A protein has these predicted regions:
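Short amphipathic alpha-helical interface segments
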Residues: 1-28
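Conserved core of the sugar-phosphate nucleotidyltransferase
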Residues: 8, 20, 173-249
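A short, conserved structural fragment
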Residues: 43-52
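Conserved beta-loop-beta/alpha segment of the NTase-like Rossmann-fold superfamily
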Residues: 125-202
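Juxta-kinase regulatory segment immediately upstream of eukaryotic protein kinase catalytic domains
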Residues: 276, 287-320
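Active-site catalytic-loop/activation-segment of kinase and kinase-like phosphoryl-transfer enzymes
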Residues: 284, 290, 408, 424-448
Length: 448
């Protein structure tokens, strides 16, 4: 089995065409002295001839390090990327003229990696065309809404060997993929100053990862793709088998599982220069990278906001996802110094809400002065635009002042004589909700 120096030198000769000692040093990153000594060893092993051409035995020596395949994770919602991710997955967005996931697939194929699996979940149909366009394998993660990305790993666990693990929304300015890799690694870039990202602690010349800390300063941070060698894949699979059914495992990133078992899962840090790897956690991040994106992206949500507020897309700033909704997706934003909130109807919300009655009730509450935040709701599609009001404190049923204010509003509403088409029948409504929940198998409490 080749050591790291032998691998780097032989790979430079075999795959990069290096034919002089200086070329080997430059292509492998080894010092000239180390390259010279390593070349002598390769000759002694019969892996290169006197002209530094690889022999037939070189391919056999490199075989254990050949990349088997790649997995692209594309199942998640990416809620921080509101509002664009409410309409389509980040991976299918067009950035600087290319669809993100398509660019990544092309880069993998340019490196000779043709066995590519895309794991989908949220808006999965958006990715199905990739089967015909690129011949990739599509795997559906049916647990994407209830578990973190460890469920994506579970879906492809049987495929993992010497495998690249990628995210569909990464953008690489240079192709980072190679057909042969020596050992498992996590790509990283250096963050100057304070950072809230996952910071790596390494040891030794090979930069073996010995610790992971969330947040730090002037540190190498986890960013971009990962490579798992066969030993790592097998070890991680055993750990995932043991922990997967534990409810505490469901919300964990696979990286959290790795960090908890770091001594059992050797992996090195692969440093990249600043500007090679891009991840877009928010719309603002992407706008910084591609200034034309916001004007070119196909977004009904942005069009709704612009039409209702009489603004341009460039006027929309400070987008912050709101997590209070049970079924809907909402975000707050700012236009010309004023804050607003937009509600995007979630999947299945129509089963619980009659939009026509909701619009009528909202309009009455606005006219009576009970809700001055309301601006507009679309009775067909269910999206709603409101003025954003920051809550000073949440309603507390044990607070007499809170209850008095709520009941005063209720008396105003009932005394108004206003009528909507829908009558309230708590028992009938509860039965219909129960039927909808049962159909989706969402009731999991034994004593319900």
């Amino acid at each position: 089995m080749l050591g790291s120096y032998e691998f780097e030198a032989l790979y430079a000769i075999y795959a990069k065409g290096a034919r002089t000692q200086r070329a080997v040093a430059a292509a492998s990153g080894l010092s000239l002295g180390t390259a010279n000594a390593t070349i002598k060893a390769l000759r002694a092993f019969g892996l290169v001839d006197d002209s530094l051409a690889p022999t037939d035995a070189a391919l056999d020596a490199l075989a254990p390090f050949k990349v088997d395949n790649a997995v692209i994770m594309a199942a998640g919602l990416s809620s921080r990327f509101a509002p664009i991710s409410y309409e389509k997955p980040k991976g299918v967005l067009r950035v600087r003229g290319e669809v993100l996931i398509e660019r990544q697939i092309r880069q993998l194929r340019e490196a000779g990696i043709d066995d590519i699996t895309v794991v989908v979940g949220y808006k999965k149909e958006e990715f199905f065309y990739l089967e015909d366009l690129f011949g990739v394998r599509i795997v559906i993660n049916h647990e994407y809404a209830t578990r973190n990305n460890n469920s994506t790993i579970r879906c492809v666990q049987h495929l993992l060997g010497n495998t690249y693990i990628c995210s569909s929304d990464d953008y690489f300015t240079e192709n980072p993929f190679e057909p042969y890799v020596f050992r498992a690694y996590y790509s990283a870039t250096f963050a100057s100053g304070p950072t809230e990202e996952w910071c790596l602690v390494t040891k030794g010349k090979e930069r073996l990862i010995s610790g992971v800390e969330v947040g730090g300063r002037d540190s190498w941070i986890m960013l971009g793709h990962v490579y798992w060698d066969r030993a790592f894949s097998q070890a991680f699979g055993r750990i995932l088998d043991a922990e997967y059914d534990d409810p505490a495992c469901a919300p964990r990133l696979w990286e959290e599982i790795y960090a908890a078992h770091i001594d059992e899962l050797p992996m090195v840090m692969h440093p990249y220069e600043d500007g090679v790897i891009w991840e877009f956690d928010s719309l603002a991040d992407l706008q910084e990278f591609d200034s034309d994106f916001i004007d070119n992206v196909d977004s009904a949500i942005m069009d709704h906001v612009c039409r209702m507020l009489g603004c341009a897309r460039s006027d929309i700033h400070g987008i912050v996802p709101l997590k209070q909704g049970l079924t809907n997706l909402s975000f707050a934003f700012e236009v010309k110094g004023r804050r607003y909130a937009y509600r995007h109807p979630g999947v299945g919300s129509d089963a619980f809400i009659r939009r026509s009655a909701e619009v009528a009730a909202e309009s009455i509450a606005y006219e009576l002065g009970l809700d001055r935040s309301f601006i507009f709701e679309d009775v067909t599609d269910g999206w709603k635009l409101s003025r954003f009001i920051a809550a000073r404190e949440p309603f507390d049923g044990r607070n007499v002042a809170h209850v008095d204010a709520a009941m005063a509003a209720a008396r105003t509403l009932h005394a108004s004589g206003a009528v909507v088409e829908r009558s309230a029948d708590p028992l009938k409504d509860a039965e219909s909700y129960l039927e909808a929940l049962s159909a989706d198998r969402r009731i999991s409490f034994r004593d319900f």
